[in-house]
Regions:
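Active-site beta->alpha loop and helix N-cap motifs at the rims of alpha/beta catalytic domains
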Residues: 51-168, 175, 185
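Terminal or standalone catalytic/regulatory effector modules within metabolic enzymes
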Residues: 40-58, 292-297, 306-548
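N-terminal amphipathic alpha-helix/helix-capping segment at the start of soluble metabolic enzymes
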Residues: 1-23, 70-75
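C-terminal helical cap(s) of enzyme catalytic domains, especially alpha/beta-barrels
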Residues: 238-260
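Catalytic cores of alpha/beta
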Residues: 155-167, 212-228
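Glycine-rich phosphate-binding active-site loops on the catalytic face of alpha/beta enzymes
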Residues: 119, 179, 225-242
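Short, well-ordered coil/turn segments that N-cap beta-strands
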Residues: 5-8, 43-45, 78-82, 113-116, ...
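Conserved, mostly hydrophobic/aromatic
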Residues: 10, 18, 39, 119, ...
């Protein structure tokens, strides 16, 4: 008897997580628009193109209105569902927001074109999903709740199945296993999806990253065990810290009961479109070749690749690279102290930065970040395990008030105050939401917008001039080579004496516009926190960067 056909569905991530993972979310809307007509004809289940770090990056780095991007992509995708990633009560920011802000953001997201909202909480605290789920259902959107997958003693198949059942009961239309670190290995995926399929009746989706090198094999086992949908990225923006390649996974399932049935010819044309963009990113340094390989440390230390990169960056800033393995050993201990949270934004940054502080200060929790304090106070929600009471007491003090309810229950409505603060810069209803998430960044954007984006125009002019110069150089006639027998008669140049001790160049000799040095944020557009302290009299600065 022939095996029953169960075509796997494809969610394409090249317009969101693909470029977020490989080029720090720097793909511009203008680079997306020319190809979306072809993408719309492929037969994707959905295209993930908004949310996550794209919102912050548009405002902070690209001088783009993220709402404008959403509207333009909606206009182009006539037949394909559009999907976004939503951090539950954190929306797309790095703190909990009042319910009225969450509800309004969901309303405007769906009104502007989003069909599917993938909602996850960093702690897997389902209370933090409630408002976003209800708001999405009210607006007629598809609710996809996501399980933040991680490893550790409490995180059993039974735990994940219980979580999935809670999500189904609260109204989820589908559930995604969100493996942000690439930790789920193939045969474990078989067990997990078989159990999930027996527990819930709604569709199941798998999201992973290729960081550890196993994601494509994990997808195969997950699909065979009942997974209905997989996240993939077009090959120019796949692999490494991104997802498995769309073309490869589609070809893998061809001719099997799981054949996706999408247009493979169109996929090749789409890959051809994105390939020059990738090459441009490599040439400019925007895409670091290091993020394209397999990082086996992800499996060894059970932490996301982006978190490892962030740790290296922090230690390099403090000239303490030799402490890297000490910090890696400290991470599991800190994670245990803080209730064993999944290592995804913002908990991955909280755990990682606190581990760095503990090692560099030579005493555990001598200095605690404000985010560590907030987590221990219960401001982010409930962790899978209780906090270490001694650590909680040391960090917060004896009489600290601990939050045990849903954290957002304690946050009063924010929208009226936010509208007042935006004031004259409000040009559209959505502006208040941009300001709510990133007040300073959004206000800078509003002012630039009001002035006609002069800085953006100057950058674009300079980029056009540089491109024209490169084209001219490429098309210029080749220079005649000087015969070798002539070269030996050319006198050697005088030695360069630029680095003369004690020499200070005059102001006019220093080239304008040199970039300032700073900590790299390879997997994110911004930081959720920063601060400082001192070690043996030397200053210590820390920054927390977004990973997912």
């Amino acid at each position: 008897m022939a095996e029953e056909k169960r075509p796997v569905k494809i969610t394409e991530t090249v317009l969101r997580d693909g470029h977020q993972s490989l080029i720090a979310t720097r793909m511009r809307t203008e680079q997306m628009l020319p190809i979306i007509d072809k993408m719309d004809k492929v037969g994707y289940y959905s295209v993930e193109m908004w949310g996550g770090a794209t919102f912050d990056a548009c405002l902070r780095f690209l001088d783009e209105d993220p709402w404008d991007r959403l509207r333009k992509l909606r206009d182009g995708f006539k037949n394909t569902k559009l999907q976004m990633l939503f951090r539950a009560q954190n929306i797309l920011g790095y703190r909990h927001y009042a319910d009225d802000v969450v509800e309004y953001f969901v309303q405007k997201s769906i009104a502007n074109g989003i069909d599917i909202i993938r909602i996850f909480d960093a702690l897997n605290d389902v209370r933090n999903l409630e408002t976003a789920v209800k708001a999405t259902k009210k607006e007629g959107g598809h609710v996809q709740t996501a399980i933040s997958y991680t490893l550790g003693e409490p995180y059993t198949v039974e735990y994940f199945c219980h979580l999935a059942k809670q999500m189904e009961d609260m109204g989820a239309d589908s559930i995604c296993v969100k493996d942000m670190a690439g930790l789920l290995i193939p045969y474990e995926a078989s067990k997990l999806f078989k159990a999930l399929k027996e527990t819930v009746k709604i569709p199941l989706q798998m999201h992973s990253h290729y960081t550890s090198g196993v994601a494509a094999m994990t997808y195969m086992r997950a699909v065979e065990a009942g997974c209905d949908i997989i996240d993939t990225a077009m090959s120019p923006f796949a692999l490494g810290t991104s997802q498995p390649a769309t073309e490869v996974m589609v070809k893998t399932f061809q001719g099997t009961p799981y054949d996706a049935g999408v247009d493979q010819g169109l996929l090749l044309e789409i890959a051809d479109y994105f390939r020059p963009i990738r090459e441009e990113c490599l040439a400019s340094g925007l895409m670091n070749p290091k993020v394209l390989g397999v990082d086996i440390n992800t499996l060894k230390y059970q932490v996301p690749g982006g978190m490892l990169s962030n740790l290296v960056s922090q230690l390099k800033d403090q000239h303490a690279e030799d402490k890297f393995y000490d910090v890696l050993k400290e991470i599991p201990a800190v994670r245990e102290d803080l209730g064993m949270p999944p290592l995804v934004t913002p908990s991955s940054q909280i755990v990682g930065t606190q581990a760095v502080m503990n090692v560099l200060f030579g005493e555990r929790y001598k200095v605690a970040t404000k985010e560590t304090k907030a987590l221990l106070r219960g401001e982010y929600g409930q962790t899978v395990r209780p906090f270490n009471k001694e650590v909680q007491k040391k960090v917060l003090g004896e009489d600290a008030e601990i939050i045990t309810c849903r954290p957002a229950d304690l946050i009063p409505n924010e929208l009226p105050k936010l509208r007042e603060e935006v004031g004259e810069y409000l040009q559209q209803d959505e502006d208040v939401l941009s300001y709510a998430l990133f007040p300073q960044v959004a206000m800078n954007f509003f002012k630039e917008r009001a002035a006609g984006f002069p800085a953006k125009a100057e950058r674009e002019k300079k980029a056009a001039e540089e491109k024209a110069a490169k084209e001219a150089a490429k098309n210029a006639p080749a220079k005649a080579e000087v015969p070798k027998e002539v070269i030996k008669y050319v006198p050697a140049p005088a030695p360069f004496l630029g680095a003369v001790p004690g020499y200070i160049p005059a102001a006019g000799e220093i080239p304008a516009g040199l970039p300032a040095e700073g900590a790299a944020a390879p997997f994110a557009p911004g930081q959720s926190a920063e601060g400082s302290g001192s070690v043996n009299g030397a200053s210590l600065n820390y920054k927390i960067n977004c990973v997912e």
